[in-house]
A protein has these predicted regions:
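Acidic, low-complexity terminal tails and accessory targeting/binding regions
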Residues: 1-5, 75-79, 85-97, 139-144, ...
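Generic structural signal for well-ordered alpha-helical scaffold segments
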Residues: 40-47, 127, 131-139
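Generic beta-sheet signal
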Residues: 7, 144-152
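Active-site signature of alpha/beta-hydrolase-fold catalytic machinery across serine-
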Residues: 68, 157-161
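Short beta-strand scaffold positions
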Residues: 56-57, 128, 149-150
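Short glycine/proline- and acidic residue-enriched helix-loop micro-motifs
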Residues: 104-125
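Short, active-site-adjacent cap segments at secondary-structure transitions
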Residues: 16, 61-63, 86-87, 154-156
Protein backbone atom coordinates (compact mmCIF):
# COMPACT_ATOMS: atom_id res chain seq x y z
CA UNK A 1 0.00 0.00 0.00
CA UNK A 2 1.34 3.43 -0.96
CA UNK A 3 2.08 5.62 2.04
CA UNK A 4 0.71 9.15 2.34
CA UNK A 5 3.04 11.94 3.40
CA UNK A 6 2.11 15.59 3.86
CA UNK A 7 4.54 18.49 3.76
CA UNK A 8 3.01 21.62 5.28
CA UNK A 9 4.41 24.98 4.17
CA UNK A 10 3.85 27.43 7.02
CA UNK A 11 4.30 31.12 6.28
CA UNK A 12 5.78 33.20 9.10
CA UNK A 13 3.61 35.52 11.22
CA UNK A 14 3.34 39.30 11.10
CA UNK A 15 6.62 41.20 11.37
CA UNK A 16 7.26 44.40 13.35
CA UNK A 17 7.67 46.78 10.42
CA UNK A 18 6.30 50.25 11.22
CA UNK A 19 8.16 51.82 8.28
CA UNK A 20 6.48 49.35 5.89
CA UNK A 21 9.65 48.53 3.99
CA UNK A 22 10.11 45.44 1.85
CA UNK A 23 12.49 43.72 4.26
CA UNK A 24 13.28 40.63 2.20
CA UNK A 25 16.38 38.93 3.60
CA UNK A 26 17.47 41.87 5.75
CA UNK A 27 18.38 41.03 9.38
CA UNK A 28 16.64 42.54 12.39
CA UNK A 29 13.02 42.00 11.36
CA UNK A 30 11.33 39.93 14.03
CA UNK A 31 7.71 39.05 14.74
CA UNK A 32 5.39 41.69 16.13
CA UNK A 33 3.22 40.92 19.16
CA UNK A 34 0.46 40.01 16.71
CA UNK A 35 2.90 37.81 14.79
CA UNK A 36 3.81 35.93 17.96
CA UNK A 37 0.10 35.27 18.54
CA UNK A 38 -0.17 34.04 14.95
CA UNK A 39 2.67 31.58 15.55
CA UNK A 40 0.84 30.25 18.60
CA UNK A 41 -2.37 29.90 16.57
CA UNK A 42 -0.50 27.94 13.92
CA UNK A 43 1.01 25.63 16.53
CA UNK A 44 -2.44 25.01 17.99
CA UNK A 45 -3.79 24.25 14.51
CA UNK A 46 -1.24 21.45 14.17
CA UNK A 47 -2.45 19.84 17.40
CA UNK A 48 -3.45 16.27 16.59
CA UNK A 49 -1.38 16.21 13.40
CA UNK A 50 1.33 13.60 13.03
CA UNK A 51 4.23 16.06 12.67
CA UNK A 52 7.59 14.29 12.87
CA UNK A 53 9.86 16.76 11.05
CA UNK A 54 10.22 20.54 11.50
CA UNK A 55 12.48 22.77 9.40
CA UNK A 56 12.66 26.55 9.00
CA UNK A 57 14.12 29.25 6.83
CA UNK A 58 17.19 30.75 8.53
CA UNK A 59 15.55 34.19 8.84
CA UNK A 60 14.57 35.29 12.34
CA UNK A 61 10.85 35.72 11.69
CA UNK A 62 10.58 32.17 10.37
CA UNK A 63 12.58 30.69 13.24
CA UNK A 64 10.33 32.54 15.70
CA UNK A 65 7.22 31.22 13.96
CA UNK A 66 8.55 27.67 14.26
CA UNK A 67 9.22 28.10 17.99
CA UNK A 68 5.75 27.37 19.43
CA UNK A 69 5.36 24.30 17.22
CA UNK A 70 8.76 23.02 18.33
CA UNK A 71 7.67 23.41 21.95
CA UNK A 72 4.35 21.68 21.31
CA UNK A 73 5.85 18.71 19.47
CA UNK A 74 9.21 18.40 21.20
CA UNK A 75 10.92 18.52 17.81
CA UNK A 76 14.17 20.35 17.17
CA UNK A 77 14.01 23.08 14.52
CA UNK A 78 16.16 22.23 11.54
CA UNK A 79 17.36 25.02 9.25
CA UNK A 80 17.31 24.86 5.46
CA UNK A 81 18.66 27.79 3.43
CA UNK A 82 16.48 26.66 0.50
CA UNK A 83 13.44 27.97 2.39
CA UNK A 84 14.75 31.55 2.58
CA UNK A 85 12.85 34.58 1.28
CA UNK A 86 13.23 35.39 -2.42
CA UNK A 87 15.95 37.82 -3.42
CA UNK A 88 14.58 41.25 -4.40
CA UNK A 89 16.22 44.36 -5.86
CA UNK A 90 13.83 46.56 -3.85
CA UNK A 91 14.83 45.11 -0.48
CA UNK A 92 14.90 47.79 2.22
CA UNK A 93 12.73 50.21 0.22
CA UNK A 94 9.19 51.44 0.83
CA UNK A 95 6.77 49.84 -1.61
CA UNK A 96 3.53 51.83 -1.37
CA UNK A 97 2.60 55.50 -1.16
CA UNK A 98 3.87 58.60 -2.92
CA UNK A 99 7.50 57.71 -2.24
CA UNK A 100 7.14 54.05 -3.16
CA UNK A 101 9.59 52.26 -5.44
CA UNK A 102 7.07 51.86 -8.28
CA UNK A 103 6.64 55.64 -8.66
CA UNK A 104 10.35 56.38 -9.14
CA UNK A 105 11.38 56.37 -12.85
CA UNK A 106 14.85 55.08 -11.92
CA UNK A 107 13.24 51.79 -10.87
CA UNK A 108 11.10 51.19 -13.96
CA UNK A 109 13.83 49.33 -15.86
CA UNK A 110 13.89 46.74 -13.09
CA UNK A 111 10.18 46.13 -13.68
CA UNK A 112 10.58 45.38 -17.40
CA UNK A 113 10.02 41.61 -17.24
CA UNK A 114 7.31 40.27 -14.90
CA UNK A 115 7.77 36.75 -16.29
CA UNK A 116 11.26 36.22 -14.85
CA UNK A 117 10.97 38.55 -12.79
CA UNK A 118 13.59 41.18 -13.66
CA UNK A 119 13.54 42.73 -10.17
CA UNK A 120 14.57 39.66 -8.22
CA UNK A 121 15.37 35.97 -7.95
CA UNK A 122 14.01 34.10 -10.99
CA UNK A 123 10.82 32.13 -10.33
CA UNK A 124 12.35 29.01 -11.84
CA UNK A 125 15.18 29.14 -9.31
CA UNK A 126 12.80 29.72 -6.40
CA UNK A 127 10.70 26.76 -7.53
CA UNK A 128 13.75 24.51 -7.91
CA UNK A 129 15.13 25.17 -4.44
CA UNK A 130 11.71 24.92 -2.80
CA UNK A 131 10.96 21.66 -4.60
CA UNK A 132 14.24 20.23 -3.36
CA UNK A 133 13.39 21.29 0.21
CA UNK A 134 9.88 19.83 -0.02
CA UNK A 135 11.12 16.52 -1.42
CA UNK A 136 13.79 16.29 1.29
CA UNK A 137 11.12 16.86 3.94
CA UNK A 138 8.85 14.27 2.32
CA UNK A 139 11.65 11.71 2.45
CA UNK A 140 12.41 12.55 6.10
CA UNK A 141 8.78 12.20 7.18
CA UNK A 142 7.62 9.20 5.12
CA UNK A 143 4.13 8.17 6.17
CA UNK A 144 3.85 11.16 8.51
CA UNK A 145 3.78 14.96 8.28
CA UNK A 146 6.51 17.59 7.98
CA UNK A 147 6.33 21.34 8.54
CA UNK A 148 8.53 23.78 6.63
CA UNK A 149 8.44 27.43 7.74
CA UNK A 150 9.08 29.77 4.83
CA UNK A 151 7.91 32.99 3.18
CA UNK A 152 5.06 34.10 0.94
CA UNK A 153 6.69 34.21 -2.49
CA UNK A 154 8.65 30.94 -2.15
CA UNK A 155 5.53 29.15 -0.90
CA UNK A 156 3.33 30.59 -3.65
CA UNK A 157 5.91 29.85 -6.33
CA UNK A 158 6.26 26.17 -5.42
CA UNK A 159 2.48 25.87 -5.35
CA UNK A 160 2.24 27.34 -8.86
CA UNK A 161 4.94 24.91 -9.98
CA UNK A 162 3.27 21.85 -8.48
CA UNK A 163 -0.12 22.77 -9.91
CA UNK A 164 1.33 23.46 -13.37
CA UNK A 165 0.30 27.11 -13.39
CA UNK A 166 2.09 30.14 -14.84
CA UNK A 167 4.52 31.96 -12.57
CA UNK A 168 3.14 35.29 -13.82
CA UNK A 169 0.70 36.54 -11.19
CA UNK A 170 -0.63 39.53 -9.25
CA UNK A 171 1.08 39.55 -5.81
CA UNK A 172 -2.13 40.92 -4.28
CA UNK A 173 -3.95 37.72 -5.25
CA UNK A 174 -1.59 35.17 -3.72
CA UNK A 175 -3.45 32.69 -1.52
CA UNK A 176 -0.79 32.76 1.20
CA UNK A 177 -1.81 34.78 4.27
CA UNK A 178 0.42 35.40 7.27
CA UNK A 179 0.84 32.19 9.31
CA UNK A 180 -1.14 30.28 6.67
CA UNK A 181 -0.57 26.61 5.90
CA UNK A 182 -0.20 25.32 2.34
CA UNK A 183 -0.27 21.53 2.61
CA UNK A 184 1.33 19.41 -0.11
CA UNK A 185 0.20 15.78 -0.15
CA UNK A 186 2.17 12.90 -1.64
CA UNK A 187 1.20 9.30 -2.35
CA UNK A 188 4.61 7.69 -2.24
CA UNK A 189 6.71 10.04 -4.37
CA UNK A 190 3.73 11.20 -6.43
CA UNK A 191 2.32 14.68 -5.88
CA UNK A 192 -1.32 14.23 -4.89
CA UNK A 193 -2.61 17.76 -4.35
CA UNK A 194 -2.58 20.95 -2.31
CA UNK A 195 -4.89 22.19 0.43
CA UNK A 196 -4.83 25.53 2.22
CA UNK A 197 -5.77 26.85 5.67
CA UNK A 198 -5.52 30.11 7.61
CA UNK A 199 -5.08 29.28 11.32
CA UNK A 200 -4.57 32.97 12.17
CA UNK A 201 -7.18 34.38 9.78
CA UNK A 202 -6.75 36.62 6.75
CA UNK A 203 -3.83 39.02 6.36
CA UNK A 204 -4.65 42.72 6.98
CA UNK A 205 -5.24 44.65 3.76
CA UNK A 206 -2.50 47.18 4.58
CA UNK A 207 0.25 44.57 4.96
CA UNK A 208 3.41 45.07 2.89
CA UNK A 209 3.02 43.05 -0.36
CA UNK A 210 5.15 39.94 -0.44
CA UNK A 211 6.39 40.36 3.11
Amino acid sequence: MTETTTVHLLRHGEVHNPAKVLYGRLPGFRLSTTGEAMALAAAEWFGGHDVTHLVSSPLERAQQTAGPLAEATGLAIGTDDRLIEAGNAFEGMVVGGAGGVFRAPRNWWKLRNPFQPSWGEPYVEIAARMLAAVEAARDAARGHEAVLVSHQLPIWTIRLHLEGRSYLHDPRRRECALASVTSVAFEGDRFAGVTYAEPAGATPSDAVPGA
